[in-house]
Amino acid sequence: MTDPTPQTAELVRAGGDHIPGLLKRVEAQLKEEAGSWGQPLGPHGGQTISAGGKRLRPLLLLLVAGEPSGDAQAERLVRAAAAIELIHSATLVHDDVLDNADLRRGRPTVFSTAGPEMATYTGDLLFARAFTLVTQDGDLFSVRELSEACSALARGELLQREDAWNTAVTVDRYLERCRLKTAALFEAACAIGADGGGLDPEPMRDFGSRIGLAFQLLDDVLDVSGPPERTGKPRGTDLLDGTVTLPLILAAERDPSIAATDLRALQDSEAAAGLCDRIAATDALEQSRARALEMVAEAKGLLPEGLDEERRDSLELVADGVVARYS
């Protein structure tokens, strides 16, 4: 199993004695996937999966589901959790191709080591294998949820490309893009976990949506404010790529000179950092954080009243952990 971050380790402990074992099974399932592909894609799939990460989406699915009633239910949850992570990994591989990214989580990307074609094929296979996992048990609910999430991911990516370089993007348009591109997979994780754990999927889907949106908003704040030694990338990387985020949108509403900025004219990290300083000089970062905190509070309020204490505590920790990651 990949080493958890301190925040993730706390969530694992809070989720109950069954969570570490289930996560180990998810990790074993991912390792089995990576080892089953053969040449030439196998090593690249393994490279992607072994890069680790927080495994937040699989963990969220398992926490929502609660302790399984038997091995058949546990196996279904493990497969679905692994599928969620495979889809998330696929999106990262494809993002690296679109962004010409050489590093991901401090490691070389498939794009940088094998080129854009091999990276594209690797991402495609990750997507395909995710659906193979959830169809093995005839899990049509998970198939439907993951299909909807993948459709949303694609639409969100298209919106991001359409909005590139445009500082006149509205807050509503930005939030819709985030809902599609980021929150949709959180929604699917929570809905699948709820279905497997005997809960109504709809309020849990809404819980996941708020958590995913807060996660993305705070990530965008960190792109402007975060030191490179913490984020692993220079400040303003999104701005250099032409990605218009909430801090920029709010700053443009407050400072006409920012609204008039031509993002295409940002030639290097130093210029992007200068724009970050101008954004930070407004209250845009504080307002972005405040919106994220509102979403976290809304997420907690969506947890069902009859939810058992263990699940409630662990899911509230997830919500708080999204904020703590950026404090």
Can you say where each PLM-predicted feature lies in the sequence?
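A glycine-biased, small/acidic residue-tolerant capping/turn segment at secondary-structure junctions
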Residues: 41, 223-231, 258-264, 313
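Amphipathic, well-ordered alpha-helical segments in soluble domains
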Residues: 26, 86-89, 126, 181-184, ...
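All-alpha helical catalytic cores of prenyl diphosphate-utilizing isoprenoid enzymes
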Residues: 2, 31, 35, 50-54, ...
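Conserved N-terminal diphosphate/IPP-binding helix and adjacent helical/loop segment
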Residues: 1-89, 93, 97-112, 160-168, ...
